[in-house]
C-alpha cells in the first residue's frame, strides 16, 4: 500500500542542519485561528519518524531548540518524515548550515518499499553553503577526455 507523505526533512551525509535557534516554535493566536500548525515543538522529535519506517531511527536529535542531523549514516538512512499527512500547505522554516553543509527539505514524497530514498518521488528545496561548498568539495581536475 502506498503512503503519501507531504513533508520530509532530508540531510546529506556530512551536513547537520541547525546548530542553534533563538526560541522554541510558537504560534500567535491569529496564526492558530488561521489554521497554522507546527511541525516541530522545539523540544522533541515527537511527530517525526524515519522514511519508510514506523519509528524514528538514529542520526537525528534536538539541539538548542532545533532539529539537527548528526551527519552519520548512509544515503538511505538520513531522512525523516512527519507522522501526519499534509495536502494543501504553506511551509515556512528557519535553518542554519555548518561550513560546507549540504542539506534540504523534500515535500510531497511517496513512501513505499520500492522507493529506498524520498528524493526519487518528491522535489527538494536544496540548502547548501555555496561559499564553503567549493572549498570542502573541490572538484577533481578534468581529465583530457572531459575537456
Predicted regions and their residues:
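Bacterial Sec-dependent N-terminal signal peptides
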Residues: 1-26
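Carbohydrate-interacting regions of secretory-pathway proteins
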Residues: 19-147
